[in-house]
Amino acid sequence: MEKSFVKRVFAFFLILAAFAFLSLPQAFAEPKGTVVMFHAGSLTMPFEAMEKEFEARYPGVDLQREASGSQAAARKVTDLNKPCDIMASADFKVIDKLLIPKHADWNIRFATNELVLCYTDKSKFAKEVNAKNWYNILQRKGVVWGHSDPNLDPCGYRALMVLQLAEKYYKKPGLYEKILANRPVENIRPKSVELVSLLQTGNMDYAWEYRSVAVQHNLKYVSLPDKINLGNYKEDPYYSQAVVKVTGKKPGEYMEMKGASTTYGITLIKNAPNQEAAVAFLEYMLNPKGGLKILKDQGQPPFIPCRVPTQKMKSTLPEKLQKLVEVKD
């Protein structure tokens, strides 16, 4: 009889344990489903590598990415109302100006970069161009050079900022307009990475790109002084002299983008269809041993730890992300 009683007690606790296990919160379950991300074109190669690594860890998740200029990515959310979980911008200010507060609550700064002038062995004056004469070569007849659309892609307005700053740095009045006079409108492309194929096929001699893009595509490039390359935060007061007007939130509206060091931002869209899996990806991406390592390996310096400007913003982050972020303006 005692044995029978023990068996019944054991069975009772076994059933209780089963119920407890089945009633565990969903947080303990692996994320699954589709995660949609709109991101800057310059992040295509590192995000491709992250996608493979993340999906290997979480086979139930399908990360679907759309690359474009950063403003274009934001407008897919604001104007086209396309379903989206995560938006990553080559300029964190695009998130601040176009997505917060209506479409996003916070903005994590995760990496930096700098502008370089890219070329190949096929480029005219490839053996001659350097950091001291590049602005003269871009004015030469027959030289084909371009940049991305400032209204769609931060690399586009940053390229114009570099030219404005070069005029001041080299003390050459009128240099900005003279260089632009040798760049036809058709050499302005929707996103900076589209210029890479034009360089590689010999259809363009020079193009403004981020250093990380140049490294990832094995392009030759001219490195510029810190005073004009938008790559050193200590030079932000000098960079702020450059201002470019671009299209704003609504048709007919414009906003001024002021020169500053190149800083990338990422956010979770408020009505994210798959918030759980999106946060899992962000937790992986912002980890120094995860996505940030891939960025570093591909020539783009990450912030370790990543940053938000205020404690108030940090407190709005999902709990899993707060440990990966510091408060630093």
Curated annotation (Swiss-Prot):
SUPFAM superfamilies the record matches: Periplasmic binding protein-like II (SSF53850)
Entry-linked Gene3D superfamilies: Periplasmic binding protein-like II
Signal found in the keyword field: yes
GO biological-process terms attached to the record: molybdate ion transport
Keywords: Signal
Signal peptide: 1-29
Any one GO MF annotation of this record: molybdate ion binding
Name of this protein: Uncharacterized solute-binding protein SYNAS_25580
Organism name: Syntrophus aciditrophicus (strain SB)
